[in-house]
């Protein structure tokens, strides 16, 4: 039975960047309801990834981390740095809320969806991933789920690492965390990553002429943080990071025209916070500022030529969160304020625009005997579409010790992006997309196996579609998504197993046709063990059939893309207590497959890396 005492002592909103690296049921998570709580008390399906997991998997991108998680389907227009989309439980890529240290990712404000191919893996210390509706807690976008990437680290000392691999991949990273007296801690990081890449596009799918070239990626990152404890209950922090990325890609091309095939992204973020961590009352105030400049251009003409485009956005955020422990649970409440400003020309919108949103929310969690109840409600006041309300509720019943039934219902929404509102084909009268979701689940511990099986349904209305006849965007689409998700983890002797299965039937509710680019079935399996000081890991992933569009000729044709089984092999060896070497083979059997029609994947890839700590 879940211990109430652990909930009472753990509930807190002291930080979105929880430092716990343990993945046990009592690991503290903050993303589900904006306050710290043991993961076992979260009724929504929750997954936590630590930096140790990322190092063990030897992931070189955020997408490689997320693709391993239940309910996640990643599609990408090629290799490193290429445009990618995250589908959670069959919902649109724009229906995933991505947070960085609890603050909305700025880049998603331009396109309406988060492209994590550009976010440096070096910054990721922890990922908290929640499936299901969370608009009642966070507002817009949280229809399919929430991904909270946490950059705060708790690794005193210095680490130097380097890696090399296929397609001329190289990576160099230096980080340090030092204590300045008893109450102050400083963290610094610098990272450089580069790959020559490969030709990502199959011939004939980018216009009248093929582009046989390497499509590489370059990323340079800096990070700094200062944390200070003023007293036993008051603390504060200042944090900033920035990255400078360049991506070469294949684009639609006709002879005689500039070939816009290079992306240059500058992004910087700054935030500061003050926290009060009392015995019964917790509170935090966080302010943040982020600025991104996203160029697409022909390198022969430069970023400032008339053929180039610039998407520039500034985002200002203020969050005030509070939590009070009451009985065997707590009540949380807070206010979010956000302003997004775009420069003229962003997202093909001639004028610059400001969009402001103020949200107030209330959350609650209470344990009564063998029952756990959870609820949340939120009201958003948006400068474009006015006021919108969402709510959710869940109940868990531990009917036998170690076994629990969970039922939940929630509403959520997605606000239209700036291009849909104000672009050349925009419609300023668009309403938010709306969702209603139901889920039922059983979970338990049987013979050493931690397992969970859930079924869900998601009805999405007022989907924003483009009308070919009126050349405008309208709220005229509907989607119906049904799915089953099963997860389990267990040990057999020295072997650790983690497995998940997803079945997703995502359809257009009007035409009854499958939604594009979603795999109908996925199987994911991770096997880890240690032998003679070598740490071994095998990753298996089955991607089922999916549908896409062939845009090489008009009218566009729907194509069916077959399933594929992928294997990765990773090994690490601690040469000394300070030096560790690692090696990995991705796509071990060199399978040829695509997740976006016409865009090739990398095939078999090798990486070799080492890290030295002191």
UniProtKB/Swiss-Prot annotation:
GO terms for cellular component: cell outer membrane; pore complex
Domain TBDR beta-barrel: 155-614
Domain TBDR plug: 38-152
Residues that, per the record, bind Ca(2+) 1: 199, 211, 213, 215, 250
A single BP term in Gene Ontology: monoatomic ion transport
UniProt entry tagged with the keyword Transmembrane: yes
Keywords: Calcium, Cell outer membrane, Ion transport, Membrane, Metal-binding, Porin, Signal, TonB box, Transmembrane, Transmembrane beta strand, Transport
Segment forming the signal sequence: 1-20
Topology class, membrane: Multi-pass membrane protein
Location within or outside the cell: Cell outer membrane
CDD domains: ligand_gated_channel (cd01347)
Position of sequence motif TonB C-terminal box: 597-614
Pfam families per UniProt: Plug, TonB_dep_Rec_b-barrel
Domain of life: Bacteria
Residues engaged in binding Ca(2+) 2: 213, 215, 249-250, 261
Spans traversing the lipid bilayer: 158-165, 169-178, 184-195, 217-227, 232-248, 263-277, 279-296, 309-325, 328-337, 353-369, 371-381, 385-400, 403-417, 434-443, 449-458, 473-490, 494-509, 517-529, 535-550, 558-572, 585-596, 602-614
Residues reported to bind cyanocob(III)alamin: 83, 85, 92, 110-111, 251, 309, 517, 551
Residue ranges of the motif TonB box: 26-33
GO terms assigned for molecular function: ABC-type vitamin B12 transporter activity; metal ion binding; porin activity
Protein family according to the UniProt entry: Belongs to the TonB-dependent receptor family. BtuB (TC 1.B.14.3.1) subfamily.
Function recorded in the entry: Involved in the active translocation of vitamin B12 (cyanocobalamin) across the outer membrane to the periplasmic space. It derives its energy for transport by interacting with the trans-periplasmic membrane protein TonB.
Name used for this protein in its record: Vitamin B12 transporter BtuB
Originating gene: btuB
């Amino acid at each position: 039975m879940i211990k109430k005492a652990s909930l009472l002592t753990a509930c807190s909103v002291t930080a979105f960047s929880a430092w716990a690296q343990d993945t046990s049921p009592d690991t503290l998570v903050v993303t589900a309801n904006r306050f710290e709580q043991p993961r076992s008390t979260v009724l929504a399906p929750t997954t936590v990834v630590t930096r140790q997991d990322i190092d063990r998997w030897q992931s070189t991108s955020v997408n490689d981390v997320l693709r391993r998680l239940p309910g996640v389907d990643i599609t990408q227009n090629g290799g490193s740095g290429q445009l990618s989309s995250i589908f959670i439980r069959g919902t649109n890529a724009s229906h995933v809320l991505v947070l960085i240290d609890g603050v909305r990712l700025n880049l998603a404000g331009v396109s309406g969806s988060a492209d994590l191919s550009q976010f440096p893996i070096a910054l990721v210390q922890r990922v908290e991933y929640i499936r299901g509706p969370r608009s009642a807690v966070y507002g817009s976008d949280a229809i399919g789920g929430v991904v909270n990437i946490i950059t705060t680290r708790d690794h005193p000392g210095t680490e130097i690492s380097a890696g090399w691999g296929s397609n001329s991949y190289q990576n160099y990273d230096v980080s340090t965390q030092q204590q300045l007296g008893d109450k102050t801690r400083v963290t610094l990081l610098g990272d450089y990553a580069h790959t020559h890449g490969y030709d990502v596009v199959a011939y004939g799918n980018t216009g009248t002429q093929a582009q046989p070239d390497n499509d590489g990626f370059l990323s340079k990152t800096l990070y700094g943080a200062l944390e200070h404890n003023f007293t036993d209950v008051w603390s504060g922090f200042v944090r900033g990071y920035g990255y400078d990325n360049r991506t070469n890609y294949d684009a639609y091309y006709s002879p005689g025209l500039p070939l816009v095939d290079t992306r240059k992204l500058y992004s910087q973020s700054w935030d500061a916070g003050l926290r009060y961590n009392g015995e019964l009352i917790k509170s935090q105030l966080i302010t943040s500022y982020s600025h991104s400049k996203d160029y697409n251009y022909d390198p022969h003409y430069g970023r400032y030529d008339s053929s180039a485009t610039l998407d520039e956005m500034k985002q200002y955020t203020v969050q005030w969160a509070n939590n009070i422990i009451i009985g065997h649970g707590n009540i949380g409440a807070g206010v979010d304020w956000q302003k997004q400003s775009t420069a003229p020309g962003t997202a093909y919108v001639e004028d610059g625009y400001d969009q402001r949103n103020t949200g107030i929310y209330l959350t609650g969690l209470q344990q009564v005997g063998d029952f756990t109840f959870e609820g949340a409600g939120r009201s958003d006041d948006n400068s474009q579409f006015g006021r919108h309300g969402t709510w959710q509720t869940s109940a868990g019943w531990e009917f036998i010790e170690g076994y629990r039934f969970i039922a939940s219902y929630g509403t959520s929404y997605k606000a239209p992006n700036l291009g849909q509102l104000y672009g050349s084909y925009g419609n300023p009268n668009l309403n938010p997309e709306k969702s209603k979701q139901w889920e039922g689940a059983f979970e338990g511990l049987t013979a050493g196996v931690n397992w969970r099986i859930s079924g869900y349904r998601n009805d999405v209305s007022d989907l924003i579609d483009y009308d070919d006849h009126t050349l405008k965007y309208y709220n005229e689409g509907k989607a119906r998504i049904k799915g089953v998700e099963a997860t389990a983890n267990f040990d057999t002797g020295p072997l650790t197993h983690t497995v998940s299965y997803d079945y997703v039937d995502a359809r257009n509710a009007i035409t009854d046709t499958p939604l594009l680019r979603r795999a109908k079935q996925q199987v994911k399996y991770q096997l880890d063990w240690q032998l003679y000081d070598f740490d071994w890991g095998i990753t298996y992933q089955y991607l089922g059939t999916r549908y896409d569009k062939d845009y090489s000729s008009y009218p566009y044709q729907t194509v069916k893309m077959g399933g594929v089984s992928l294997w990765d092999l990773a090994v690490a060896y601690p040469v000394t207590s300070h030096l560790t070497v690692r090696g990995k083979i991705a796509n071990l059997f060199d399978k040829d497959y695509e997740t976006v029609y016409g865009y090739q994947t990398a095939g078999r890839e090798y990486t070799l890396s080492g890290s030295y700590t002191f």
